[in-house]
């Protein structure tokens, strides 16, 4: 897969628990090092519970707080990156399509061009309904990278689909 080097990046991550909580710090570091504009949106309607502390990337001080907000604030503060979070579950296709809609960024220079964001939808969810929603959003999109991750106690998988126009 070849990514365009001249487009801003937008990552929308659904799920901030077992998988998303551990993926987030690496994505923050990666986006921080890019030589182009980048946005990171973390979505999850769940709160940190005591049972999450042994297998998710949270600490006792996070108990009762929204998972998306905790991750967004923790890592954006450390790296000085502005991050968006949605403290709700994404349950409808219109909600998801609005989240993955690319913004235009001014590229500057003599001609003052605009470039659309390259959007990456990252599924870190633990339910089939949201996976189906992501798949439908991918099917209706014209320009999207969709990465879905899932795991059980002893197994896991990652699936990547791409519709990138260079």
Question: Across the structure, where does each feature detected by a protein language model lie?
Answer:
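A short, basic/flexible loop-to-alpha-helix module at the beginning of a structural domain
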Residues: 1-11, 30-33
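Glycine-rich adenosine-cofactor-binding loop
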Residues: 10-29, 44
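Short, surface-exposed basic-aromatic patches at helix termini and helix-loop junctions that form
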Residues: 32-33, 98-107, 111-115, 132-144
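Glycine-rich phosphate-binding loop and adjoining beta1-alpha1-beta2 segment
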Residues: 39-81
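A structured beta-alpha segment of the ubiquitous adenosine-cofactor-binding alpha/beta core
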Residues: 66-117, 125-127
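ADP-ribose/adenylate-binding Rossmann-like module
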Residues: 120-159
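Conserved small/polar residues in nucleotide/adenosyl-binding loops
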Residues: 164-166
């Amino acid at each position: 897969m070849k990514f365009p080097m001249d487009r801003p990046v937008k990552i929308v991550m659904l799920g901030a628990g077992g998988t998303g909580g551990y993926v987030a710090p690496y994505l923050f570091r990666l986006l921080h090092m890019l030589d182009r504009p980048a946005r990171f949106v973390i979505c999850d309607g769940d709160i940190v519970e005591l049972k999450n502390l042994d297998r998710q990337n949270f600490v006792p001080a996070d108990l009762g707080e929204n998972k998306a907000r905790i991750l967004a604030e923790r890592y954006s503060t450390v790296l000085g990156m502005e991050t968006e979070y949605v403290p709700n579950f994404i349950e409808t296709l219109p909600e998801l399509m609005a989240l993955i809609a690319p913004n235009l960024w001014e590229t500057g220079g003599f001609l003052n061009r605009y470039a659309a964001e390259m959007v990456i939808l990252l599924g870190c969810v633990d339910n089939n309904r949201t996976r189906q929603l992501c798949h439908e959003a991918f099917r209706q999109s014209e320009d999207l990278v969709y990465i879905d991750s899932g795991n059980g106690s002893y197994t896991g998988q990652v699936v990547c689909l791409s519709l990138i126009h260079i």
